[in-house]
From Swiss-Prot:
InterPro entries: Znf_C2H2_sf, Znf_C2H2_type. GO terms for biological process: negative regulation of cell population proliferation; negative regulation of erythrocyte differentiation; positive regulation of transcription by RNA polymerase II; regulation of transcription by RNA polymerase II; transcription by RNA polymerase II. It is found in: Nucleus. Disulfide bonds: none annotated. Keywords: Activator, DNA-binding, Metal-binding, Nucleus, Phosphoprotein, Repeat, Transcription, Transcription regulation, Zinc, Zinc-finger. Residues 23-35 have a biased composition (Basic and acidic residues). Phosphorylated by PRP4K; phosphorylation regulates its transcriptional modulator activity. This is Krueppel-like factor 13. Residues 96-111 have a biased composition (Pro residues).
Amino acid sequence: MAAAAYVDHFAAECLVSMSSRAVVHEPREGPEPRPEGAAAAAPTLPRVDERRDGKDSASLFVVARILADLNQQAPAPAPAERREGAAARKARTPCRLPPAPPAPPPGPEPASPGQAGAPAAPPSPAWSEPEAALEQEPGPAGSGEPGLRQRGRRGRSRADLESPQRKHKCHYAGCEKVYGKSSHLKAHLRTHTGERPFACSWQECNKKFARSDELARHYRTHTGEKKFSCPICEKRFMRSDHLTKHARRHANFHPGMLQRRGGGSRTGSLSDYSRSDASSPTISPASSP
């Protein structure tokens, strides 16, 4: 900084000296009166002064031009100054927002309900909720009036998605079982309440059961009845699940063999050997074979 200030000061001195000496080169209007004693030396002195002044002014003029050219070239800014300048220009630059979308054209006016051949209603805008979207369906023939049906596209309840055959739900917390018959639901609810309404009527047997099929299986232990026979070896069993387990051990066994047999050798219903919550119709011990 000190060197630059010195150079500027020196250039200013040169320019001042050039401006002060410029009067010497201007022609004078008339000769000035000179003293009589200096008449002999007068012709030689002005020539020497003019030569010296010309050399000095020429050298000062060259130096001034060089310094002026140097001052016009600004020094390169430091990296930190460049970053600061870029940040300042970025801060001064106004933020440009994207252009706003054009407004939708106005739709046609809705026609009265009695007007025949009325144009369809314009589609709902993009920002409307899809749950409340209206779907058009053709009205009755000859009416000329479109029927509107409102249907939710997203939020559908679980009951709508379930099969209509399974509509009896368990109301206990944490239990999500659903049944197709109310009797099956009642039998399942006994697993929560602990109720056992089906008691064994055999002498000195006080066992009770929550389902009638369980009572029927138990009653066969008293009578010794074995109504389930194997279609291959004719071996008999009290329970159908015991028969199925035995029949699968045969090499030539096929599941259709148990389904074709009837009468006293039938396999029975699925509830006789399964642990499902479905309840079969009530069978009293007296009516069971």
